[in-house]
């Protein structure tokens, strides 16, 4: 069974005299590497180019320096902050036998001064202090991000690419309509198959055909729209082929097919949920809700008690998708226990109550789908399609 992710603190005993600790402040043009060497009074810091081999040579040199001071180095721990570079560096260092972690960038506490000093050197020292506290097993210093395999990262690309293409399609359609409205044309539909032919027949509100430059711009926009639609179709067809090819194999594709059996959930939503959250082996339902950002933000001080709303600290794709799915679930699963629970708590029909409770429903629904793919427990009263 895959190991459950619990990265809020280290569960390994920290022997400071036997552990070389290295942190990396990663930027686009350079890496600033700081270390804590057992037996060495100085706290070395070295600026490197973004080169993995040079970094490895520096780590081994620091290890030899600590060994020459009489320390038996049995553990090398490296950490850097999650960001643009992703996880390739962590995977590469792990292949060389180096214990590597990726720090959640929002989990490191910083000074609340209105104008605090910020440099790469100060950031490196801050990361080092947070990482040392995490290695000691103390909570609250920082938390780590689970390092996905390259296959897991690749599996997320189709859904994310499709989401981007759908946004591009909407922008192109809106741009075409906005251009036509300037000439008093409001009924043109750019998604029709014969849109190019209809465009040539259009007349402005002044009764004249579209002029050459405007017509050329619109034809190019329609060509872009056709290309985007073809790419979306290609991604969807490829996903269906992959699901059919792996019909007898356990894994993420089996989870997608299982979730897609729930009436009201399509292949696209199921694929997003599986690859973004449900295949991550999270510890419990609380960790699941926190990762999706579907938890509250309490604000308590003295006698004041209030809720500031959603934390929004997790995966925005999952949070947005679950809110949309919750509304859809009410429409397609009216007889389910979750739908009845929502109706009972929104009997006053107040808009504020419905908006608050839809978030609670989204959280409960996410947990129900997690139980479905991990234990096979079907949501109470939910309707299922026949097995694919």
PLM regions: where:
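Low-complexity, acidic/Ser/Thr- and charged residue-rich accessory regions of DNA metabolism proteins
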Residues: 303-304, 342-388
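Mobile genetic element proteins and their domesticated derivatives, centered on retroelements
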Residues: 23-25, 33, 78, 104, ...
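Glycine-rich, often acidic, oxyanion-interacting loops/wings at catalytic, nucleic-acid
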Residues: 154-258
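Gly/Thr-rich phosphate-binding beta-strand-loop-beta motif of the actin/hexokinase/Hsp70
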Residues: 11-37, 127
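Short glycine-rich, Thr/Ser-proximal phosphate-binding strand/loop in the N-terminal lobe
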Residues: 28-56
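Short alpha-helix plus adjacent loop in nuclease-associated cores
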Residues: 44, 101-144, 198-203, 304-314
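Short, basic/hydrophobic alpha-helical segments
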Residues: 52-77
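Phosphate-backbone recognition surface of nucleic-acid-processing proteins
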Residues: 254-354
């Amino acid at each position: 069974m895959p190991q459950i992710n619990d990265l809020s603190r280290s569960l390994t005993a920290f022997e400071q005299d036997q552990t070389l600790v290295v942190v990396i402040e990663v930027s686009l043009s350079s890496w600033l590497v700081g270390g804590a060497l057992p037996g060495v009074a100085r706290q070395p810091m070295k600026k490197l180019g973004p080169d993995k081999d040079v970094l490895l040579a520096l780590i081994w040199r620091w290890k030899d320096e600590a060994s020459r001071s009489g320390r038996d180095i049995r553990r090398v721990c490296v950490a850097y902050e999650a960001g643009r570079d992703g996880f390739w560096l962590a995977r590469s260092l792990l292949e060389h036998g180096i214990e590597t972690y990726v720090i959640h960038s929002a989990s490191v506490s910083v000074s609340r001064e209105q104008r605090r000093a910020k440099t790469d050197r100060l950031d490196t020292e801050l990361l080092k202090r947070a990482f040392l506290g995490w290695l000691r097993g103390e909570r609250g210093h920082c938390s780590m991000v689970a390092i996905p395999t390259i296959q897991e990262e690749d599996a997320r690309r189709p859904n994310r690419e499709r989401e981007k293409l759908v946004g591009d399609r909407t922008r192109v359609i809106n741009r075409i309509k906005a251009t036509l409205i300037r000439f008093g044309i409001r009924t043109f539909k750019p998604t029709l198959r014969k849109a190019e032919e209809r465009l040539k027949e259009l007349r402005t509100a002044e009764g004249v055909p579209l002029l050459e430059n405007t017509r050329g711009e619109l034809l190019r926009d329609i060509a872009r729209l056709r290309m985007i639609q073809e790419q979306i179709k290609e991604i969807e067809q490829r996903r269906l082929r992959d699901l059919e090819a792996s019909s007898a194999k356990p894994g993420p594709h089996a989870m997608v097919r299982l979730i897609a059996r729930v009436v009201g959930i399509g292949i696209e939503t199921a694929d997003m949920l599986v690859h973004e959250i449900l295949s991550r082996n999270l510890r419990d339902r609380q960790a699941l809700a926190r990762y999706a950002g579907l938890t509250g933000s309490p604000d308590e001080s003295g006698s004041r008690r209030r809720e500031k709303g959603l934390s929004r600290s997790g995966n925005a794709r999952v949070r947005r998708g679950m809110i949309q799915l919750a509304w859809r679930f009410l429409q397609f699963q009216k007889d389910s226990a979750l739908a009845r629970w929502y109706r009972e708590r929104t009997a006053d029909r107040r808009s504020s109550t419905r908006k608050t409770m839809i978030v609670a429903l989204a959280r409960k629904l996410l947990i129900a789908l997690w139980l479905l793919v991990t234990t096979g427990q079907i949501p109470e009263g939910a309707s299922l399609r026949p097995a694919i």
